[in-house]
Amino acid sequence: MKNLRSQIPFILIFNFFSSGCHTLLDTDRNLLIQQADHLEKKGRYYWERRINPDHAKKAQIFLSIAYELKPEADNLAILYSQACYFNGLYIEQIPEKKDSLFLEGYHIAKGIVYHSKSFQKGFNAVEDNNLIRELRGIEALEKSFVPALYWWVANLGRYLINKPVVE
């Protein structure tokens, strides 16, 4: 599993250098999009079979790599955030790794919400402190972003649940 994830960057680097070190052309972008689509498809395939812990882990790996290639795809990002939550809650046993998964899912989902136009409109409408601005942004959020908002809060809640109130 780790071998697969560690090989992907080397393959991409090899492709870059073997192609003459030129900048991305339209054909290169199309190839990256095709690779991302294939990785997303594999991630969804394993996600549908997440009853098997190995499949849940593979789904998260494929979805994370696809997300790195296509960070603007909100549905992919939401699924990746959900996979982080699932693996952190049900699969992973080591507390530090659980926290890492919950934080990853939190940051992904929060990024979706923060980059939405409706959130930004509400967020920038007031000049108060950041908490009030954030609440205004959430109030202005379109209904289509509710799943991202849910996974933002679910991942953050699971991360914070075992943390001390005062250190």
Where do the protein language model's features map onto the residues?
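Bacterial N-terminal signal peptides that target proteins for export
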Residues: 1-8
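Short coil/linker segments at helix-helix boundaries
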Residues: 34-61, 80-167
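Bacterial N-terminal signal peptides
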Residues: 9-19
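Bacterial Sec signal peptide processing site at the extreme N-terminus
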Residues: 21-36
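Surface-exposed, polar/charged faces of alpha-helical domains
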Residues: 61, 68-72
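Short helix-capping/linker turns of helical repeat alpha-solenoids
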Residues: 72-73, 144
